[in-house]
């Protein structure tokens, strides 16, 4: 499904469906013997939407026809769960470190099915602003309310498209740009054109003061590599062709059709230019640090993203 300038989506459609894939990985990690993170609400979202490809991680076994053409698929899926678990732990720790240091405002850009407002032990008085499409936020809040879950902080939903004037919406929701804040942009960058990425950071710059912090999952050096793109596309098409025959109800999305393959400024460089102290951790290093390095035969299937942590001077 190609993107348009004003596209929107339900939770099971387009960009919304990718949030279910991430929730599936977090649910699988939570069920594992030695989980790196605990997200008791991830499975709640999956149960609410019913069967789909996002339930692969809980399937007793994959179709034999699929394993014939992609024998390493179980290892690929295991590696992606480890990647998502490491990513989640990185952002969890980033938020808690900042708020325990006295920052009282947290902003989650493109919050999706992120349940941090409910599951993290936030310091008393913390306000968490969640920004995303209206239908995504409505689904999340309604589903968790039906489950009896309550936020562990002062949670504020800001229903707005990040391509629109979200800074005004954020301020109107109670955000105070005159005091320090902590931000996240997780799983967002490939869905933004290069110009929109720059605008996003410029707006964050205009809403932050000294000691504010931001963590970004930035695109790595291989994102635009033609061979990497071709290999990924061919692999997805092979899997889609088999699944259309054996399990047509579990359509494999062409996630890469939702991405913007454009040259863009390195995220770490952007923040350094704007007087932020920056630390960059490659995804492989992050995963290894958590004891979750991918198996050698599938490490090229794991995103080579960069995890950027920055504090404003």
Swiss-Prot record:
Where S-adenosyl-L-methionine is bound, by residue?
132, 161-162
Enzyme Commission code(s) on record: 2.1.1.-
InterPro entries linked: Ppm1/Ppm2/Tcmp, SAM-dependent_MTases_sf, SAM_mthyl_Trfase_ML2640-like
- What GO biological process terms are annotated to this protein in UniProt? methylation
Question: A GO molecular-function term, please?
Answer: methyltransferase activity
Tree of life domain:
Bacteria
Task: Spell out the SUPFAM superfamilies in the cross-references.
Answer: S-adenosyl-L-methionine-dependent methyltransferases
State whether keyword Methyltransferase applies. yes
Name the Pfam families on file. LCM
Q: Which UniProt keywords apply?
A: Methyltransferase, S-adenosyl-L-methionine, Transferase
Q: Does the keyword Cytoplasm apply?
A: no
Q: Which family does it belong to?
A: Belongs to the UPF0677 family.
**What job does the chain carry out?**
Exhibits S-adenosyl-L-methionine-dependent methyltransferase activity.
The molecule here is called: Putative S-adenosyl-L-methionine-dependent methyltransferase MUL_0706
Instruction: Provide the taxonomic classification.
Output: Bacteria, Bacillati, Actinomycetota, Actinomycetes, Mycobacteriales
């Amino acid at each position: 499904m190609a993107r348009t300038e004003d596209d929107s989506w339900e939770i099971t459609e387009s960009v919304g469906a990718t949030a279910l894939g991430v929730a599936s990985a977090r649910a699988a990690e939570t069920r594992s013997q030695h989980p790196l993170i605990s997200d008791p609400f991830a499975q709640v979202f999956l149960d609410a939407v019913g069967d789909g490809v996002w339930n692969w991680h809980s399937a007793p076994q994959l179709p034999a026809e699929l394993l014939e053409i992609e024998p390493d698929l179980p290892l690929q899926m295991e590696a992606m769960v480890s990647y998502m678990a490491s990513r989640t732990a990185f952002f969890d720790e980033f938020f808690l470190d900042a708020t325990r240091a006295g920052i009282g405002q947290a902003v989650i850009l493109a919050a999706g099915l992120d349940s941090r407002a409910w599951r993290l032990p936030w310091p008393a008085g913390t306000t968490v602003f969640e920004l995303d499409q209206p239908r995504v936020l409505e689904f999340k809040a309604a589903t968790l309310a039906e489950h009896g879950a309550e936020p562990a902080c002062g949670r504020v939903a800001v229903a707005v498209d990040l391509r629109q004037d979200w800074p005004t919406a954020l301020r109107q929701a109670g955000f105070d740009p005159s005091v320090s804040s902590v931000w996240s942009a997780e799983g967002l960058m490939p869905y933004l054109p290069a110009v929109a990425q720059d605008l996003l950071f410029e707006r964050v710059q205009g809403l932050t003061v000294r000691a504010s912090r931001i963590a970004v999952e930035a695109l790595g050096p291989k994102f635009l590599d033609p061979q990497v793109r071709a290999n990924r596309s061919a692999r997805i098409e092979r899997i889609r062709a088999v699944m259309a025959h054996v399990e047509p109800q579990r359509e494999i999305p062409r996630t890469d059709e939702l991405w913007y393959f454009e040259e863009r400024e390195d995220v770490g460089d952007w923040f350094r230019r704007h007087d932020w102290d920056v630390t960059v951790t490659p995804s492989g290093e992050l995963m290894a640090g958590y004891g979750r390095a991918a198996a050698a035969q599938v490490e090229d299937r794991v995103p080579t993203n960069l995890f950027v942590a920055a504090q404003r001077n």
